[in-house]
């Protein structure tokens, strides 16, 4: 199927979202980029936005509604857990995005090429899905920057990080926190079982260290 790459990309992107969330601690949820500036979303608000906005895009633009039968979802705030803790956000997003993935796998080329409403314009569903993936990646990047501001280690999200050994050109490895989403949820529910990081090593881990 011509658009299988979009389904495959969503399958991995949803895991990357939960993986980044797993790097935070519960006490981090109220943290904003600047403590005295309410314009920047807190960690908790980023999780809320991801859950709510993805639900709205899929429901209203792609016609995929996975929250209609959820018993643990607040009616006034679709796609949100009843308790807004780090673990509950991860479980809720993993469950709902898994249902969306299953629905996407059933769609044919005609569905992907059909037009839908994107705010005030018409676009193909394939176009909307591409934008959705980029939107999610944007907010995930914001959270990764906040992890650095908090002084936290970072496992891989796409490729090497400073904590997996540094730069790609120096052959630093890609090390994910967990081997699968299932292992992630099980490990975090047990208090955390992330794969150990080797650290920065003896080479520069950024492009212009001076």
Indicate residue ranges for each PLM-predicted region.
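Active-site rim elements
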Residues: 1-8, 82-90, 130-133
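Short, contiguous alpha-helical
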Residues: 7-18, 29-75, 117-210
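Hydrophobic alpha-helical core bundles mediating ligand binding, dimerization, or RNAP-core interactions
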Residues: 10, 14, 21, 93-101
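Membrane-proximal, proline-rich intrinsically disordered regions
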Residues: 24-26
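Helix-adjacent hinge/juxtasegments
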Residues: 60, 65-107
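Acidic catalytic patch
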Residues: 104-119
